[in-house]
């Protein structure tokens, strides 16, 4: 993945669905894992208002601040020269990966469940691991 923005929610549902279909697995599990510590994979409704709510809520919870002085709202992690401490915290809240059942060769999800990649510190190339296990 290469997200040009600092933060973005991107649907990866159809790509995961395609990989499951191509695998030929009829009964099993698929693991979808953000392979970076500043990104998440999660499942929820594909509704833009909800995504905007996530953005607002996470920014209120852990606001972006490139500084490293806690007295002014900065983060000690940013003393490393990075400015992405908030991204690490946001990933902890949203999680690392999802595991979805495969039944009859298809993703076994609820009617409103959709798989997303959530980038918290974009502008660089990142990977997603999709591991399909089953028969």
Regions found by a protein language model. Name each.
Residues 1-135:
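Active-site histidine-anchored catalytic micro-motif
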């Amino acid at each position: 993945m290469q997200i040009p923005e600092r933060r973005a929610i991107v649907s990866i549902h159809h790509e995961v669905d395609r990989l499951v279909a191509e695998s030929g697995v009829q009964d099993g599990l698929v693991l979808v894992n953000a392979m970076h510590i500043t990104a998440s994979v999660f499942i929820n409704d594909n509704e833009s208002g909800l995504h905007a709510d996530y953005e607002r809520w996470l920014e209120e919870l852990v606001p972006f601040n490139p500084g490293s002085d806690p007295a002014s709202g900065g983060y000690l992690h940013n003393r490393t020269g990075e400015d992405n401490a908030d991204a690490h915290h946001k990933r902890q809240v949203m999680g690392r990966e999802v595991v979805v059942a495969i039944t009859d060769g298809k993703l076994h999800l609820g009617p409103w469940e959709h798989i997303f990649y959530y980038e918290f510190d974009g502008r660089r190339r990142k990977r997603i691991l999709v591991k399909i296990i089953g028969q």
